[in-house]
């Protein structure tokens, strides 16, 4: 089923038991790239699908960021109208994004006021369960939710009705938090991780109703957790080391979507290549399917630059239809990389990135001005303006196609936040609320000697320069019309000829090397003669140029609209307070 079909007024035959809500982003977050991409979080859909399959109840979800149903007087999804139209017995909220958590709490309070029990999971409520339980949530699910949710529903629902004293049964369920009948906080203990992901149901995107538009891309989740422990991240802490479902399960999931007409996929795993042999196996299956079925689809994955060290993996990803890599470079400053525990040097990042740029579109993700602490072992003595110059140089040297530069976000549960809290550098929520925790706002007090306004504005300036260009370019070449006119006319044969000459020289140099390697193993991408191969490569380079221009033009529109909203916001007053506190600390 294509999502959104029920938004056209179709009647639901079976009365739903549970509604899952993916809360709306705040206004400014809706204008960043994440807010523009229509793609639901996999976690809550996986839990709801599991309940539908194993518990035999009807469920549905709404994504408030892609919603075409009834609206209230404030222009928000009208849950009163939804409850009248399709009354439910339980509410389940997605609490994985700090910047939308306030909206989730507001919606939960409405359902709670109607006598409907409310459940929430996700990294934010996992880290701050007491906040959630005092904000409209009855039960917080910690960690993975598929098995836990089934036990919760069994405790809450009997013969289609909510059990009044269900809280007495909750203490037997491991992995949850709640307030008992005396309003005392109860945590039932850490639950053992799910061992067999193959036993879980594939997330059913068809349960999302009242959609405004089709998905930008289909999210695919193969694994959970991460083997790395970056200071700013919570994935390893929440899910532990990486584990994955079988190659066959993921392949069949993607294949089923392709057979139903979907062509764009995004693998949401933090590192697509955590298990390289299995990743190569999956890519071979996808490539064989593409070759035999003649169906074309496009895949974007998140990886670390280490994938550049494995030629077999690169070839397999190209064979599978992987065209774009999202890479968390984070910083072009070695001291900051060490502080983050990235386990890589700037020199390695540049070397690997240049190689990967020959085969894929590279989207680089960065954190600007990573904070240091009183006891930091690694500190950079560069000024913010010097750091900005290092970023510009890195973008060019590493041959990155598109970028996003954010401030460090002190996510609840992260080691970064704990360190900032220890030095009293997290402002109260009354000053900087959760709605600002999307990377585009400075949400902590900088270290002594660092200007808060400069730290806030330099990442924005970098994005503005990258996508909008100089003042002259913004006004004379609005929407890149000169670039489009050139690239689609006289520039097309010129660019193609340049790309062909470069590729021919490169392929000629690599020809003997490939011969030696491939005598021992079978190639996935059949190597043709150097003339034809260079033509194919030059055509791919030309398409990549056009793609980058399209993304840059779209990105410029996002940045332009965001800057307008930002200039009208009251955030500058919060920045002044951060600056005042920094000055007071310097005086002391």
Segments predicted by a language model, with ranges:
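Glycine-rich beta-alpha loop elements in corrinoid/cobalamin-binding modules
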Residues: 50-190, 413
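A short helix->loop->beta-strand "cap" motif at the edges of active sites that frequently abuts
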Residues: 16, 113-117, 295-297, 360
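Catalytic cores of alpha/beta
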Residues: 130-134, 312-314, 372-396
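Radical SAM enzyme core and accessory elements
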Residues: 1-20, 58, 79-87, 181, ...
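Glycine- and acidic-residue-enriched helix-capping/strand-helix junction motifs
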Residues: 29-44
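Radical SAM [4Fe-4S] cluster-binding motif and immediate context
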Residues: 198-372, 381, 393
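Flexible glycine/acidic-rich beta-alpha junction loops that bind and position SAM and/or redox cofactors
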Residues: 27-30, 129-131, 228, 276-277, ...
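N-terminal [4Fe-4S]-dependent radical SAM core
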Residues: 2-17, 24-32, 173, 178-222
């Amino acid at each position: 089923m294509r999502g959104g079909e029920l938004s056209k007024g179709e009647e639901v035959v079976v009365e739903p038991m549970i509604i899952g809500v993916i809360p709306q982003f705040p206004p400014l977050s809706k204008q960043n790239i994440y807010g523009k991409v229509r793609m639901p979080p996999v976690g809550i859909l996986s839990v709801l699908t599991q309940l539908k399959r194993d518990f035999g109840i009807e469920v549905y979800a709404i994504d408030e960021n892609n919603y075409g149903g009834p609206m209230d007087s404030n222009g928000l999804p009208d849950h009163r109208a939804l409850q009248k139209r399709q009354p439910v017995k339980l509410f389940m909220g997605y609490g994985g994004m700090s910047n939308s958590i306030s909206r989730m709490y507001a919606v939960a309070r409405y359902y709670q006021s109607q006598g409907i029990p409310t459940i929430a999971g996700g990294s934010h409520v996992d880290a701050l369960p007491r906040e959630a339980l005092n904000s409209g949530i009855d039960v917080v699910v910690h960690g993975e939710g598929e098995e836990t949710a089934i036990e919760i529903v069994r405790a809450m629902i009997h013969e289609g009705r909510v059990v009044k004293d269900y809280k007495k049964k909750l203490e037997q369920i491991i992995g949850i938090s709640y307030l008992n009948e005396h309003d005392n906080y109860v945590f039932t203990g850490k639950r053992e991780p799910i061992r067999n992901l193959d036993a879980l149901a594939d997330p059913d995107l068809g349960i999302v109703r009242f959609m405004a538009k089709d998905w930008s891309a289909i999210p695919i989740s193969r694994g959970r957790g991460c083997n790395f422990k970056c200071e700013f991240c919570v994935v390893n802490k929440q899910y532990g080391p990486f584990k994955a479902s079988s190659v066959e399960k993921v392949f069949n999931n993607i294949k089923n979507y392709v057979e139903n007409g979907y062509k764009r996929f995004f693998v949401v795993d933090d590192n697509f290549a955590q298990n390289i042999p299995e990743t190569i196996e999956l890519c071979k299956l996808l490539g064989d399917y593409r070759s035999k079925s003649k169906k074309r689809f496009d895949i974007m994955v998140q990886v670390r630059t280490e994938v550049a060290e494995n030629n077999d993996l690169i070839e397999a990803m190209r064979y599978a239809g992987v065209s774009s890599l999202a890479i968390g470079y984070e910083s072009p400053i070695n001291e900051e990389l060490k502080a983050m525990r990235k386990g890589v040097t700037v020199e390695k990042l540049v070397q690997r990135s240049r190689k990967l740029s020959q085969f894929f579109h590279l989207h680089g993700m960065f954190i600007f001005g990573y904070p240091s602490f009183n006891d930091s072992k690694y500190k950079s003595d560069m000024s913010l303006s010097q750091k900005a110059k290092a970023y510009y140089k890195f973008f060019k040297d590493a041959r990155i196609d598109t970028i996003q530069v954010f401030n460090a976000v002190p996510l609840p549960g992260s080691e970064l936040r704990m360190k900032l809290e220890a030095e009293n550098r997290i402002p109260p929520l009354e000053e900087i609320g959760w709605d600002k925790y999307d990377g585009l706002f400075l949400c902590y007090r900088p270290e002594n000697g660092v200007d808060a306004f400069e730290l806030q504005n330099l990442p924005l300036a970098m994005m503005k320069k990258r996508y909008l260009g100089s003042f002259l370019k913004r006004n004379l070449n609005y929407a890149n019309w000169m670039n489009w006119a050139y690239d689609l006319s006289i520039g097309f044969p010129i660019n193609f000829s340049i790309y062909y000459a470069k590729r021919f020289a490169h392929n000629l140099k690599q020809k003997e090397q490939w011969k030696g390697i491939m005598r021992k193993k079978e190639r996935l991408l059949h190597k043709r003669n150097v003339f034809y191969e260079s033509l194919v490569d030059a055509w791919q380079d030309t398409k990549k140029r056009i793609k980058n221009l399209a993304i840059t033009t779209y990105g410029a529109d996002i940045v332009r609209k965001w800057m307008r909203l930002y200039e009208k916001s009251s955030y500058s007053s919060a920045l002044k307070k951060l600056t005042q506190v920094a000055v007071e600390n310097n005086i002391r």
